[in-house]
């Protein structure tokens, strides 16, 4: 095969992944809805994985802080072998049930434990999910095998059957891509339902550098239609926090009142704006949850 034929083959196989993921979406939606309720009650999300699965979990958890300003410790990735295994393969650690149990020792009843294993039988993940079941945590399994050995340990089975890999057994390929898509969809839908977006905008993002500070201004302009100068003035009054500035501009109220409304409604912009505008009839429950609404 020519090099072009090789990469075309890989790409053709990758194109099948989205369809495999689609089969797991009903289970994923149920997981998100139940996870939202648990997180509102003080629960945390814990990912457990080894090898590629663990690395993907670490990536997803790490990205939530800058994207949605999720406090550290709210979404936690447990990678078999720890930090050193992120850059140097440590394949043997995935075989330890006890290591998985140890990693899961901090789980509480209101938490959510999500195991990731392409094979559906990784002992490290099995140990973690066993502890999760013992304490009453919500459990889910992300895998490539619909008949996964660990399926009985999960309240929600997210099985994306991606089929044989281009390189037999190399689950970092299609199976890994499917896991990444499911993680993206889970964490993003979770943040939407928790009110950390407004329309399709990242209104809870953490602006930690020049690029992101510029993005905050543009997001505020896009959401409100104000000029660059007005947006910057509003952000200055809100100490750079996007949500209070947004409610201030959209509701025509002072920044402190905007902060108070947001605090009263768990940071959900739609609910804060609804109270600022007074009682309304026919407001959708999805708006109260901070779900996607038409762009403004």
Locations of regions flagged by a protein language model:
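Short, glycine-rich nucleotide/cofactor-binding loops
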Residues: 17-26, 115-122
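Glycine-rich phosphate-binding loops that contact phosphosugars or nucleotide phosphates
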Residues: 45-194
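Catalytic, metal-anchored helix/loop core of enzyme active sites in primary metabolism
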Residues: 7, 11, 36-39, 48, ...
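A short, well-structured juxtamembrane/interface segment
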Residues: 23-38
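Short, amphipathic alpha-helical interaction segments embedded in low-complexity terminal/linker regions
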Residues: 185, 190-296
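Gly-rich Lys/Arg/Thr-decorated short loops/hinges at beta-loop-alpha junctions or inter-strand turns
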Residues: 9-17, 77-87, 198, 239
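Cofactor-/ligand-binding subdomain signature composed of acidic, glycine-rich
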Residues: 1-20, 24
């Amino acid at each position: 095969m020519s090099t072009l034929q090789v990469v075309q083959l890989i790409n053709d196989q990758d194109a099948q992944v989205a369809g495999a993921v689609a089969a797991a979406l009903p289970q994923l939606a149920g997981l998100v809805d139940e996870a939202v309720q648990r997180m509102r009650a003080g629960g945390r999300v814990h990912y457990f994985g080894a090898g590629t699965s663990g690395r993907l979990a670490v990536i997803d958890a790490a990205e939530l802080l800058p994207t949605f300003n999720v406090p550290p410790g709210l979404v936690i990735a447990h990678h078999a072998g720890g930090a050193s295994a992120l850059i140097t393969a440590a394949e043997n650690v995935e075989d330890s049930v006890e290591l998985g149990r140890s990693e899961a020792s901090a789980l509480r009843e209101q938490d959510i434990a999500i195991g990731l294993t392409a094979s559906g039988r990784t002992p490290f993940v099995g140990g973690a999910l066993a502890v999760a079941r013992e304490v009453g945590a919500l459990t889910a399994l992300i895998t490539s095998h619909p008949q996964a050995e660990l399926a009985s340990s999960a309240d929600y089975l997210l099985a994306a059957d991606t089929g044989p890999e281009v390189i037999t057994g190399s689950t970092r390929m299609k199976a890994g891509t499917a896991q990444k898509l499911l993680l993206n969809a889970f964490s993003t839908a979770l943040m939407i339902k928790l009110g950390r977006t407004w329309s399709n905008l990242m209104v809870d993002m953490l602006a930690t550098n020049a690029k992101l500070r510029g993005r905050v201004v543009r997001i505020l302009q896009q959401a409100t239609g104000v000029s660059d100068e007005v947006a910057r003035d509003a952000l200055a009054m809100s100490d750079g926090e996007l949500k209070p500035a947004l409610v201030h501009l959209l509701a025509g109220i002072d920044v402190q009142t905007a902060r108070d409304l947001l605090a009263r409604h768990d940071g959900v912009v739609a609910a804060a704006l609804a109270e600022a505008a007074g009682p309304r009839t026919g407001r959708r429950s999805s708006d109260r949850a901070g779900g996607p609404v038409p762009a403004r």
